[in-house]
């Protein structure tokens, strides 16, 4: 299975929005934020089915009577290191999420991985993006501690480009950074200092996007083979609304990037997960990065 793009997802049987633990959730009133569970399962299953048609997808089991409302956002559960069979479990700053990493670590332990919980605050693959070899890009400052990356460098020989996150709407790195290939990275360039941008440029080419395009979820994408998967609710927005204008601009930019690289964009409606502050990349954890090795043309 090592040559097959492999991912992990979770059926959202415990998904809820009772605890508002990010700024995006504050935009909903008490009635609109309630999760339609059957619809959430259908939305997740659409993404699962597509990924499974292109590779392999593990399903992280949800324990009976599980109360972890955000378990479905597996990109925060931890990260699989690519040069050695080790799974680093998260150390959540969001207190209602503590315990998710235990379920993930047990699962990867059953697969034969060595599992270790980060001794410092760290919220998983959503904060630490793999590029190639031992090179990663890590976000810190809101949900993750910079010391977590220093520990990983010392313990596992990683080379981590560390970027400070300051915008509460971009509280995880995947809100501003998307490794498009192992040599290029989509970046919301206004999110970072000139020095931070230069540190990225030392290891990869930068494909720039705007902050508005980041806020509407452009970098919350997943690549599998020659497809880019992204969440979009544009079909349900009024064409006269400001939200439609922002969403349309994001989609056009993503489609431009895809077209320039002989790729195709596939959109998924994930309205139920937007209630929890999540988009497509939040639902997916990479077990490997074979999609990075696939030739674009």
Model-predicted regions and their roles:
Residues 1-297:
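The feature marks the mature, well-folded catalytic cores of soluble enzymes
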């Amino acid at each position: 299975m090592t040559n097959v793009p492999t991912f992990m997802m979770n059926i959202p049987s415990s998904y809820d929005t009772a605890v508002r633990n990010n700024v995006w959730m504050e935009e909903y009133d008490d009635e609109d934020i309630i999760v339609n569970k059957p619809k959430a399962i259908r939305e997740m299953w659409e993404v699962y089915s597509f990924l499974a048609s292109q590779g392999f997808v593990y399903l992280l089991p949800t324990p009976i009577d599980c109360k972890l409302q955000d378990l479905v956002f597996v990109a925060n559960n931890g990260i699989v290191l690519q040069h050695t069979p080790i799974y680093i479990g998260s150390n959540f700053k969001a207190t209602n999420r503590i315990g998710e990493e235990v379920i993930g670590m047990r699962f990867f332990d059953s697969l034969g991985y060595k599992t270790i919980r980060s001794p410092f605050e760290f919220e998983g693959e959503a904060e630490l993006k793999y590029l190639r070899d031992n090179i990663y890009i890590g976000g810190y400052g809101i949900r993750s501690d910079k010391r977590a990356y220093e520990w990983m460098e010392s313990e596992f020989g990683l080379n981590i480009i560390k970027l400070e996150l300051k915008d509460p709407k971009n509280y995880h790195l995947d809100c501003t950074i998307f490794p498009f290939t192992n040599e290029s990275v989509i970046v919301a360039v206004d999110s970072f200092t000139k020095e931070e941008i230069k540190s990225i440029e030392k290891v990869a080419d930068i494909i720039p996007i705007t902050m508005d395009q980041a806020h509407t979820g452009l970098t919350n994408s997943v690549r599998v083979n020659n497809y880019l998967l992204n969440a979009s609710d544009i079909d349900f927005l009024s064409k006269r609304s400001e939200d439609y204008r922002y969403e349309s601009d994001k989609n056009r930019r993503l489609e431009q990037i895809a077209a320039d690289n002989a790729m195709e964009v596939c959109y998924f409606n994930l309205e139920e997960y937007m209630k929890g502050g999540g988009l497509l990349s939040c639902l997916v954890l990479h077990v490997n990065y074979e999609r990075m090795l696939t030739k674009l043309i």
